[in-house]
Amino acid sequence: MSTAGKVIKCKAAVLWEQKKPFSIEEVEVAPPKAHEVRIKMVAAGICRSDDHVVSGTLVAPLPVIAGHEAAGIVESIGEGVTTVRPGDKVIPLFIPQCGKCSVCKHPEGNLCLKNLSMPRGTMQDGTSRFTCRGKPIHHFLGTSTFSQYTVVDEISVAKIDAASPLEKVCLVGCGFSTGYGSAVKVAKVTQGSTCAVFGLGGVGLSVIMGCKAAGAARIIGVDINKDKFAKAKEVGATECVNPQDYKKPIQEVLTEMSNGGVDFSFEVIGRLDTMVAALSCCQEAYGVSVIVGVPPDSQNLSMNPMLLLSGRTWKGAIFGGFKSKDSVPKLVADFMAKKFALDPLITHVLPFEKINEGFDLLRSGKSIRTILTF
Protein backbone atom coordinates (compact mmCIF):
# COMPACT_ATOMS: atom_id res chain seq x y z
CA MET A 1 0.00 0.00 0.00
CA SER A 2 1.45 3.35 -1.07
CA THR A 3 2.25 5.90 1.62
CA ALA A 4 2.71 8.74 -0.90
CA GLY A 5 0.72 11.83 -0.02
CA LYS A 6 -0.06 10.53 3.47
CA VAL A 7 1.30 11.35 6.92
CA ILE A 8 3.67 8.57 8.04
CA LYS A 9 3.90 7.59 11.71
CA CYS A 10 7.36 6.27 12.58
CA LYS A 11 10.08 6.27 15.22
CA ALA A 12 12.60 9.07 15.61
CA ALA A 13 15.21 10.07 18.18
CA VAL A 14 14.05 13.39 19.61
CA LEU A 15 16.34 15.62 21.66
CA TRP A 16 14.01 17.50 24.02
CA GLU A 17 16.72 19.27 26.02
CA GLN A 18 20.50 19.76 26.06
CA LYS A 19 22.76 17.34 27.92
CA LYS A 20 19.98 14.72 28.06
CA PRO A 21 19.73 11.40 26.17
CA PHE A 22 17.77 11.12 22.94
CA SER A 23 14.22 9.87 23.41
CA ILE A 24 12.82 7.34 20.91
CA GLU A 25 9.37 8.73 20.10
CA GLU A 26 6.57 8.11 17.66
CA VAL A 27 6.55 11.07 15.29
CA GLU A 28 4.34 12.09 12.40
CA VAL A 29 6.16 12.91 9.18
CA ALA A 30 4.13 15.04 6.77
CA PRO A 31 4.22 14.36 3.01
CA PRO A 32 6.71 16.35 0.95
CA LYS A 33 5.55 19.69 -0.44
CA ALA A 34 6.61 20.97 -3.87
CA HIS A 35 10.35 20.48 -4.51
CA GLU A 36 10.70 18.25 -1.44
CA VAL A 37 11.61 14.58 -1.04
CA ARG A 38 10.59 12.11 1.68
CA ILE A 39 13.25 9.50 2.43
CA LYS A 40 13.09 6.15 4.21
CA MET A 41 16.30 6.05 6.21
CA VAL A 42 18.46 2.90 5.96
CA ALA A 43 21.68 3.86 7.76
CA ALA A 44 22.99 6.88 9.66
CA GLY A 45 26.39 7.67 11.12
CA ILE A 46 26.92 9.34 14.49
CA CYS A 47 29.08 12.43 13.99
CA ARG A 48 30.76 14.62 16.58
CA SER A 49 28.72 17.61 15.35
CA ASP A 50 25.53 15.81 16.44
CA ASP A 51 27.03 15.46 19.92
CA HIS A 52 27.87 19.17 19.92
CA VAL A 53 24.12 19.80 19.69
CA VAL A 54 23.50 17.59 22.73
CA SER A 55 26.22 19.36 24.73
CA GLY A 56 25.13 22.83 23.61
CA THR A 57 28.50 23.62 21.98
CA LEU A 58 26.50 24.12 18.78
CA VAL A 59 23.24 25.91 19.42
CA ALA A 60 20.19 24.39 17.72
CA PRO A 61 16.53 25.11 18.55
CA LEU A 62 14.89 22.37 20.63
CA PRO A 63 13.17 19.97 20.48
CA VAL A 64 15.08 18.68 17.45
CA ILE A 65 15.64 15.54 15.38
CA ALA A 66 19.40 15.63 14.82
CA GLY A 67 21.56 13.58 12.43
CA HIS A 68 23.10 14.67 9.13
CA GLU A 69 25.25 11.77 7.85
CA ALA A 70 23.07 9.08 6.31
CA ALA A 71 21.74 7.18 3.32
CA GLY A 72 18.27 5.97 2.41
CA ILE A 73 15.69 5.32 -0.28
CA VAL A 74 13.24 7.84 -1.71
CA GLU A 75 9.71 7.01 -0.49
CA SER A 76 7.85 9.82 -2.29
CA ILE A 77 8.45 13.16 -3.98
CA GLY A 78 6.65 16.48 -4.05
CA GLU A 79 5.46 18.32 -7.12
CA GLY A 80 8.20 19.54 -9.46
CA VAL A 81 10.97 17.21 -8.24
CA THR A 82 13.08 16.07 -11.20
CA THR A 83 16.44 14.83 -9.86
CA VAL A 84 15.21 11.81 -7.86
CA ARG A 85 12.34 9.32 -8.05
CA PRO A 86 10.71 6.94 -5.56
CA GLY A 87 12.97 3.91 -5.07
CA ASP A 88 16.22 5.80 -5.74
CA LYS A 89 19.09 5.33 -3.31
CA VAL A 90 20.07 8.75 -1.98
CA ILE A 91 22.25 10.64 0.48
CA PRO A 92 20.80 13.72 2.22
CA LEU A 93 23.04 16.80 1.98
CA PHE A 94 23.56 19.04 5.01
CA ILE A 95 25.07 21.61 2.64
CA PRO A 96 22.59 22.10 -0.21
CA GLN A 97 23.52 22.97 -3.79
CA CYS A 98 20.88 25.16 -5.42
CA GLY A 99 23.02 25.68 -8.52
CA LYS A 100 21.81 29.26 -8.91
CA CYS A 101 23.39 31.40 -6.17
CA SER A 102 26.73 33.23 -6.44
CA VAL A 103 28.49 30.53 -4.39
CA CYS A 104 27.15 27.62 -6.45
CA LYS A 105 28.20 29.43 -9.64
CA HIS A 106 31.71 30.11 -8.31
CA PRO A 107 34.20 27.39 -9.29
CA GLU A 108 35.56 27.03 -5.74
CA GLY A 109 32.85 27.81 -3.18
CA ASN A 110 30.48 25.19 -1.77
CA LEU A 111 28.60 26.93 1.06
CA CYS A 112 25.39 27.46 -0.93
CA LEU A 113 23.44 30.58 0.07
CA LYS A 114 20.37 28.38 0.63
CA ASN A 115 22.34 26.70 3.43
CA LEU A 116 19.98 26.02 6.35
CA SER A 117 21.97 27.27 9.31
CA MET A 118 21.61 25.50 12.63
CA PRO A 119 19.51 28.20 14.34
CA ARG A 120 16.83 27.92 11.62
CA GLY A 121 15.67 24.39 12.37
CA THR A 122 13.21 24.27 9.46
CA MET A 123 12.77 23.34 5.81
CA GLN A 124 13.57 25.98 3.15
CA ASP A 125 9.99 27.32 3.44
CA GLY A 126 10.43 28.02 7.16
CA THR A 127 8.17 25.21 8.43
CA SER A 128 8.63 21.71 9.88
CA ARG A 129 7.45 18.32 8.57
CA PHE A 130 7.79 16.64 11.99
CA THR A 131 5.18 16.51 14.76
CA CYS A 132 5.49 14.73 18.11
CA ARG A 133 3.02 14.82 21.00
CA GLY A 134 1.14 17.50 19.08
CA LYS A 135 4.17 19.80 18.84
CA PRO A 136 6.23 20.69 15.77
CA ILE A 137 9.79 19.33 16.05
CA HIS A 138 12.74 21.23 14.60
CA HIS A 139 14.79 19.98 11.66
CA PHE A 140 18.60 19.85 11.80
CA LEU A 141 20.72 21.21 8.93
CA GLY A 142 17.90 20.38 6.51
CA THR A 143 18.51 16.63 6.98
CA SER A 144 17.33 15.23 10.39
CA THR A 145 18.49 11.69 9.73
CA PHE A 146 17.85 10.20 13.21
CA SER A 147 14.34 9.27 12.08
CA GLN A 148 12.93 6.31 10.15
CA TYR A 149 11.57 8.83 7.64
CA THR A 150 12.68 12.39 6.94
CA VAL A 151 11.76 15.13 4.48
CA VAL A 152 14.43 17.18 2.71
CA ASP A 153 14.44 19.85 0.03
CA GLU A 154 15.36 18.66 -3.45
CA ILE A 155 18.50 20.81 -3.35
CA SER A 156 19.55 18.84 -0.23
CA VAL A 157 19.60 15.31 -1.65
CA ALA A 158 21.79 13.42 -4.14
CA LYS A 159 20.96 10.26 -6.08
CA ILE A 160 23.69 7.62 -5.82
CA ASP A 161 24.60 4.29 -7.44
CA ALA A 162 21.73 1.80 -7.07
CA ALA A 163 24.21 -0.96 -6.15
CA SER A 164 25.93 0.96 -3.35
CA PRO A 165 25.85 -0.46 0.22
CA LEU A 166 24.02 2.24 2.17
CA GLU A 167 25.38 1.13 5.56
CA LYS A 168 28.86 2.13 4.29
CA VAL A 169 28.35 4.99 1.84
CA CYS A 170 26.31 6.91 4.43
CA LEU A 171 29.75 8.15 5.60
CA VAL A 172 30.06 10.07 2.32
CA GLY A 173 27.26 12.27 3.71
CA CYS A 174 29.67 13.94 6.14
CA GLY A 175 32.68 12.42 7.87
CA PHE A 176 34.57 10.81 5.01
CA SER A 177 33.99 13.61 2.48
CA THR A 178 34.84 16.31 5.02
CA GLY A 179 38.24 14.78 5.74
CA TYR A 180 39.15 13.46 2.31
CA GLY A 181 38.17 16.71 0.56
CA SER A 182 40.15 18.79 3.06
CA ALA A 183 43.27 17.06 1.74
CA VAL A 184 42.58 16.62 -1.98
CA LYS A 185 40.41 19.68 -2.67
CA VAL A 186 41.01 22.34 0.00
CA ALA A 187 44.72 21.94 0.83
CA LYS A 188 45.47 20.38 -2.58
CA VAL A 189 48.15 18.13 -1.06
CA THR A 190 51.02 17.52 -3.48
CA GLN A 191 53.04 14.45 -4.46
CA GLY A 192 55.99 13.80 -2.16
CA SER A 193 54.88 16.30 0.50
CA THR A 194 54.90 16.04 4.30
CA CYS A 195 51.57 16.37 6.15
CA ALA A 196 50.54 16.56 9.82
CA VAL A 197 47.02 15.60 10.91
CA PHE A 198 45.85 16.69 14.38
CA GLY A 199 43.04 14.46 15.66
CA LEU A 200 42.65 10.83 14.59
CA GLY A 201 38.90 10.31 14.74
CA GLY A 202 36.85 9.33 11.70
CA VAL A 203 37.37 12.66 9.94
CA GLY A 204 41.09 12.76 10.77
CA LEU A 205 41.53 9.26 9.35
CA SER A 206 39.72 10.42 6.21
CA VAL A 207 42.18 13.34 5.93
CA ILE A 208 45.01 10.79 6.10
CA MET A 209 43.35 8.77 3.30
CA GLY A 210 43.17 11.96 1.21
CA CYS A 211 46.82 12.81 1.86
CA LYS A 212 47.81 9.30 0.85
CA ALA A 213 45.65 9.40 -2.30
CA ALA A 214 47.31 12.71 -3.25
CA GLY A 215 50.76 11.09 -2.98
CA ALA A 216 52.11 12.57 0.27
CA ALA A 217 55.42 10.92 1.22
CA ARG A 218 55.14 11.51 4.96
CA ILE A 219 51.92 11.68 6.97
CA ILE A 220 52.29 12.36 10.70
CA GLY A 221 49.27 11.63 12.90
CA VAL A 222 48.93 13.64 16.12
CA ASP A 223 46.68 12.57 19.01
CA ILE A 224 46.82 12.29 22.80
CA ASN A 225 45.12 8.86 22.57
CA LYS A 226 47.82 6.43 21.42
CA ASP A 227 45.17 3.71 20.97
CA LYS A 228 44.31 5.50 17.71
CA PHE A 229 47.79 5.13 16.20
CA ALA A 230 47.43 1.60 14.79
CA LYS A 231 44.31 2.50 12.80
CA ALA A 232 45.93 5.74 11.57
CA LYS A 233 48.88 3.75 10.24
CA GLU A 234 46.53 1.21 8.69
CA VAL A 235 44.93 3.94 6.54
CA GLY A 236 48.18 5.66 5.57
CA ALA A 237 49.95 7.52 8.41
CA THR A 238 53.70 6.93 8.22
CA GLU A 239 54.22 7.81 11.90
CA CYS A 240 52.23 9.06 14.90
CA VAL A 241 53.12 11.30 17.83
CA ASN A 242 51.51 11.97 21.21
CA PRO A 243 52.01 15.59 22.38
CA GLN A 244 52.00 14.37 26.00
CA ASP A 245 55.24 12.48 25.36
CA TYR A 246 57.18 15.75 24.90
CA LYS A 247 58.18 18.59 27.19
CA LYS A 248 58.13 21.17 24.39
CA PRO A 249 55.09 22.35 22.39
CA ILE A 250 53.98 19.94 19.67
CA GLN A 251 54.50 22.53 16.92
CA GLU A 252 58.22 22.63 17.79
CA VAL A 253 58.40 18.83 17.78
CA LEU A 254 56.77 18.65 14.33
CA THR A 255 58.91 21.47 12.92
CA GLU A 256 62.05 19.59 13.99
CA MET A 257 60.73 16.26 12.69
CA SER A 258 60.08 17.81 9.28
CA ASN A 259 63.29 19.87 8.99
CA GLY A 260 61.65 23.27 9.22
CA GLY A 261 57.93 22.64 9.05
CA VAL A 262 55.41 20.43 7.27
CA ASP A 263 53.99 21.29 3.85
CA PHE A 264 50.38 20.74 4.91
CA SER A 265 48.71 20.55 8.32
CA PHE A 266 45.13 19.80 9.32
CA GLU A 267 43.33 20.53 12.60
CA VAL A 268 40.53 17.97 12.92
CA ILE A 269 39.64 18.47 16.59
CA GLY A 270 37.98 21.87 16.92
CA ARG A 271 40.23 23.33 19.64
CA LEU A 272 41.64 26.84 19.38
CA ASP A 273 45.07 25.92 20.80
CA THR A 274 45.56 23.06 18.34
CA MET A 275 44.46 25.30 15.44
CA VAL A 276 47.34 27.67 16.22
CA ALA A 277 49.71 24.71 16.78
CA ALA A 278 48.75 23.27 13.39
CA LEU A 279 49.35 26.62 11.70
CA SER A 280 52.67 27.08 13.51
CA CYS A 281 54.04 23.66 12.54
CA CYS A 282 53.69 24.22 8.81
CA GLN A 283 56.61 25.64 6.81
CA GLU A 284 56.72 29.41 7.36
CA ALA A 285 57.19 30.45 3.72
CA TYR A 286 54.79 28.12 1.90
CA GLY A 287 53.02 25.86 4.39
CA VAL A 288 49.24 25.44 4.19
CA SER A 289 47.10 24.74 7.26
CA VAL A 290 43.43 23.75 7.04
CA ILE A 291 40.84 24.07 9.83
CA VAL A 292 38.57 21.01 9.60
CA GLY A 293 37.33 20.60 13.19
CA VAL A 294 34.28 22.61 14.24
CA PRO A 295 35.22 25.16 16.92
CA PRO A 296 32.91 26.13 19.80
CA ASP A 297 30.35 28.75 18.73
CA SER A 298 31.33 31.58 21.00
CA GLN A 299 35.12 31.55 21.15
CA ASN A 300 37.61 33.87 19.48
CA LEU A 301 41.17 33.05 18.58
CA SER A 302 44.26 35.10 19.33
CA MET A 303 47.34 34.47 17.21
CA ASN A 304 50.40 36.33 16.02
CA PRO A 305 49.84 37.61 12.45
CA MET A 306 53.58 37.17 11.77
CA LEU A 307 52.72 33.48 11.36
CA LEU A 308 50.91 34.47 8.16
CA LEU A 309 53.08 37.39 7.03
CA SER A 310 55.98 35.02 6.39
CA GLY A 311 53.98 33.18 3.73
CA ARG A 312 51.80 30.55 5.39
CA THR A 313 48.23 30.01 4.19
CA TRP A 314 45.39 29.35 6.65
CA LYS A 315 42.21 27.90 5.20
CA GLY A 316 38.96 26.36 6.29
CA ALA A 317 36.16 24.50 4.57
CA ILE A 318 32.94 22.72 5.33
CA PHE A 319 32.24 19.31 3.76
CA GLY A 320 35.77 19.15 2.35
CA GLY A 321 35.09 21.99 -0.07
CA PHE A 322 32.96 19.67 -2.21
CA LYS A 323 29.91 20.98 -4.04
CA SER A 324 27.49 18.51 -2.51
CA LYS A 325 24.98 17.51 -5.18
CA ASP A 326 27.71 17.27 -7.84
CA SER A 327 30.32 15.52 -5.72
CA VAL A 328 28.47 12.96 -3.57
CA PRO A 329 27.45 10.71 -6.52
CA LYS A 330 31.06 10.86 -7.83
CA LEU A 331 32.51 9.97 -4.43
CA VAL A 332 30.14 7.00 -4.14
CA ALA A 333 31.18 5.93 -7.66
CA ASP A 334 34.84 6.17 -6.59
CA PHE A 335 34.07 4.00 -3.56
CA MET A 336 32.36 1.43 -5.81
CA ALA A 337 35.47 1.51 -8.04
CA LYS A 338 37.56 0.72 -4.90
CA LYS A 339 39.48 4.02 -5.01
CA PHE A 340 39.13 4.25 -1.22
CA ALA A 341 37.82 2.07 1.61
CA LEU A 342 35.22 2.98 4.23
CA ASP A 343 35.38 -0.19 6.34
CA PRO A 344 38.36 1.04 8.43
CA LEU A 345 36.22 3.93 9.70
CA ILE A 346 33.30 1.78 10.89
CA THR A 347 33.89 0.26 14.32
CA HIS A 348 30.33 -0.34 15.52
CA VAL A 349 26.93 -1.06 13.96
CA LEU A 350 23.87 -0.68 16.20
CA PRO A 351 20.11 -0.73 15.70
CA PHE A 352 18.74 2.82 15.58
CA GLU A 353 16.94 2.34 18.92
CA LYS A 354 20.37 2.06 20.63
CA ILE A 355 21.37 5.57 19.55
CA ASN A 356 22.31 6.62 23.10
CA GLU A 357 24.77 3.70 23.32
CA GLY A 358 26.32 4.94 20.09
CA PHE A 359 26.83 8.42 21.55
CA ASP A 360 28.36 6.90 24.70
CA LEU A 361 30.88 5.06 22.49
CA LEU A 362 31.76 8.34 20.75
CA ARG A 363 32.20 10.27 24.01
CA SER A 364 34.35 7.56 25.59
CA GLY A 365 36.67 7.44 22.55
CA LYS A 366 35.85 3.76 21.98
CA SER A 367 34.41 4.21 18.49
CA ILE A 368 35.52 5.83 15.26
CA ARG A 369 32.18 5.72 13.48
CA THR A 370 29.06 4.01 14.77
CA ILE A 371 26.47 3.26 12.10
CA LEU A 372 22.82 3.12 13.12
CA THR A 373 20.66 0.79 11.04
CA PHE A 374 16.91 1.26 10.61
UniProtKB/Swiss-Prot annotation:
GO cellular component: cytosol
Amino-acid positions noted as binding NAD(+) in the UniProt annotation, renumbered to this chain: G199, L200, G201, G202, V203, G204, D223, K228, V292, G293, V294, R369
The protein's required cofactors: Zn(2+)
EC annotation from Swiss-Prot or TrEMBL: 1.1.1.1
GO molecular function terms noted in the UniProt entry: all-trans-retinol dehydrogenase (NAD+) activity; zinc ion binding
Recorded catalytic activity of this chain's protein: a primary alcohol + NAD(+) = an aldehyde + NADH + H(+); a secondary alcohol + NAD(+) = a ketone + NADH + H(+)
Binding residue positions for Zn(2+) 2: C98, C101, C104, C112
Chief location: cytoplasm
Source organism, top-level taxon: Eukaryota
One GO process term, biological-process aspect: retinol metabolic process
InterPro entries in UniProt: ADH-like_C, ADH-like_N, ADH_Zn_CS, GroES-like_sf, NAD(P)-bd_dom_sf, PKS_ER
Quaternary state and interactors: Dimer of identical or non-identical chains of two types (E and S) coded by 2 separate genes at different loci.
Entry's family note: Belongs to the zinc-containing alcohol dehydrogenase family. Class-I subfamily.
Official protein name in the record: Alcohol dehydrogenase S chain
Organism: Equus caballus (Horse)
